[in-house]
Design a protein with these regions (language model features):
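A glycine-centered loop/beta-turn motif at secondary-structure junctions
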Residues: 34, 81, 107-108, 125-134, ...
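Catalytic grooves of carbohydrate-active enzymes
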Residues: 218-227, 344, 348-351, 355-366, ...
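A short, well-structured beta->alpha microelement
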Residues: 55-80, 439-446
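C-terminal membrane-anchoring or membrane-association module
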Residues: 539-553
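Short alpha-beta junction capping motif
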Residues: 40, 78-122, 279-283
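Metal-dependent polysaccharide deacetylase catalytic core of the NodB/CE4 family, i.e.
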Residues: 37-39, 248, 252-377
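Acidic (Asp/Glu)-rich catalytic clusters
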Residues: 101-104, 210-212, 237-246, 265-289, ...
């Protein structure tokens, strides 16, 4: 009996060992795989904006982090984590268990915003005295003083002998107060929201808190809103200039132009297609900027596509349908049912747009390697849908489904969980607005500020219809900053739609697709074949007739 049992145990051991080594998807690692735990408190859904901002900030440093609401804290052993970050997004009395867990935690701790005064044992050096308004932030070590677009509320704190690395200047001109304070590995940020530049200040302090010594500036330029009605000659002129300057860049392409009853595809603009191919072969990375960049009756490039801007909500209905509101339903249950059906419609609508866009670009040998939502507006479900097809996302992020006017860009590339595996390459500088005489002055101010942070993206987009001279000014300003130009093709990007697979690595493309991957490509092939066939037939018929006549003679 003993021998049989020992033999059985040996078999189990061998079985487990084989599975552990032969099946990499199965892990038998002990302990928690996450090094950072982010705990947060909220009292309403509006506060999800700051929670998502924090998630985006942490995603710049760590992929292995976990988000958890304070009410779930009793389900986690905090000491499984190397770092714990707490965000008080809303004022709240914390549970005894939550406070005890923080007090007993052995690792590095960072508190942000509300409720920090409840961690008295953990932060005995922190004294929260009240509130104040600030209109500037300062990071002395970075030689940086930055104006706020509006006054912000912060907690007025004193911290005894703790180190102060960030300051705020009071709006009433009465002096400065601490924003970022720490004693050894325990930190506190006194701001009551995380919109930039507060987010940038906290990000800078995260470098010390998370022991990340990365430094450097990344620059990128994106040519925006290139659709089938764009001027190919103007675009070619800019492409040749960027090639001459040896600057890699992105081109945000919209495959279809639509305005009222006018619909133009790339197949109707062969000169533009030739220019886009030239760009792709000479430094450009193609970005899919939606499919039509419009939803209702707006012109391509002006309208939204993946957000119902008129009603400030996700795409729940076909564009031609009268938009139903909450007031159209007698009960909350009926409205919830409408929303569920709307989410199903949105999924089909977006899947169709993404598939069609990739298929049409690929049919012209144009290979998109990242996605950008028109006006950066897209629902949380939208991010899930896009992530099934693209590994890279470009621009800024919409934080919640409550409004599209809640966008955020971190300082550096990030991989927040709500992007479902996609990497964000952020746009941080904005664009040159037509008719704004101070546009370059504003851009240069942003460049100067951004370049003072330890690690940052200096990234802008430019509309080609503004001409070559304006583009040269933007490039000149960016070239004055030390840093590397981002060549997205050098990153690992993956795009998958039905039978089409596009992958980049070290600047090269790997494209897998059937000979004719879509109805669009099939029709394009027939059209091209006819163009070649008709002259050929016209030549062969007279030649054959002449040959027959000569033989009869």
């Amino acid at each position: 009996m003993f021998l049989k049992r020992g033999f059985a145990v040996s078999l189990v051991f061998v079985f487990v060992t084989v599975f552990a080594f032969d099946f990499p998807g199965i892990s038998f690692a002990s302990g928690n795989e996450n090094t950072v735990l982010v705990l947060y408190s909220k009292t309403n859904e509006e506060q999800m904006k700051d929670i998502r901002i924090l998630e985006t900030m942490v995603g710049q440093f760590k992929n292995d982090y976990k988000m958890m609401e304070d009410e779930e804290a009793d389900q986690a052993n905090l000491n499984d984590y190397e770092y714990v970050i707490y965000l008080g997004a809303g004022k709240k009395t914390l549970s005894h268990h939550m406070k005890s867990a923080i007090d007993d935690y052995k690792g590095a701790f960072y508190a942000i915003g509300h409720n920090a005064e409840q961690f008295k044992e953990r932060l005995p050096w922190l004294d929260v005295r009240g509130e104040a308004l600030v209109n500037q932030v300062a990071l002395p070590k970075n030689d940086l003083v930055q104006d706020l677009s509006e006054d912000r509320i912060v907690y007025e704190v004193s911290a005894d002998d703790a180190e102060v690395s960030g300051f705020g200047y009071k709006a009433d001109g009465s002096g400065s107060l601490p924003l970022v304070v720490n004693e050894e590995d325990d930190y506190y940020f006194s701001g009551q929201n995380l919109y930039n530049p507060f987010g940038e200040v906290v990000t800078e302090s995260f470098r010390l808190f998370l022991n990340d010594g990365s430094k450097g500036t990344v620059k990128y330029l994106r040519l925006e809103d290139v659709h089938p009605m764009a001027d190919p000659e103007l675009l070619r002129e800019q492409a040749e200039y960027l090639k001459k300057e040896n600057i890699p860049y992105m081109v945000a392409v919209i495959p279809v132009y639509e305005n009222k009853d006018k619909i133009v595809h790339l197949s109707d603009s062969p000169k533009l297609v030739d220019t886009l191919r030239y760009m792709q072969e000479n430094g450009a990375s193609i970005i899919m900027h939606g499919y039509k960049h419009q939803y209702r009756s707006s012109e391509t490039g002006e309208g939204f596509e993946f957000w119902d801007a008129e009603n400030d909500r996700p795409i729940y209905q076909p564009a031609k349908d009268k938009a139903k509101q909450r007031s159209d339903f007698s009960t909350a249950e009926e409205y919830d049912e409408f929303v569920k059906k709307g989410e199903k419609y949105e999924k089909g609508y977006m899947e169709n747009a993404i598939r069609s866009g990739v298929e049409e670009l690929v049919a012209h040998d144009l290979y998109p390697i990242a996605f950008e939502a028109p006006h950066y507006a897209i629902s949380q479900q939208g991010y899930r849908i896009v992530s099934k097809h693209f590994s890279s996302y470009v621009g800024q992020l919409q934080l919640t489904d409550s409004t599209w006017q809640s966008e955020y860009a971190p300082m550096h590339e990030s991989k927040p969980d709500f992007l479902h595996g996609m990497i964000l390459y952020p746009e941080t500088l904005g664009y040159i607005e037509q008719g704004d005489a101070k546009a370059m002055e504003k851009l240069n101010a942003k460049i100067e500020t951004g370049s003072k942070y330890s690690q940052s993206y200096l990234s802008a987009f430019y509309h080609p219809y503004l001409g070559l001279d304006g583009l040269k000014e933007v490039v000149k300003s960016l070239n004055e900053v030390n840093g590397d130009w981002l060549d997205l093709k050098q990153k690992d990007n993956l795009v998958q739609v039905k039978d089409i697979r596009i992958q980049t690595k070290d600047g090269g493309y790997q494209v897998e697709k059937p000979f004719l991957a879509s109805d669009y490509e099939r029709n394009l092939f027939i059209k091209k074949s006819l163009i070649w066939a008709i002259p050929l037939v016209l030549f062969i018929l007279p030649a054959a007739s002449l040959l027959v006549i000569r033989r009869r003679e």
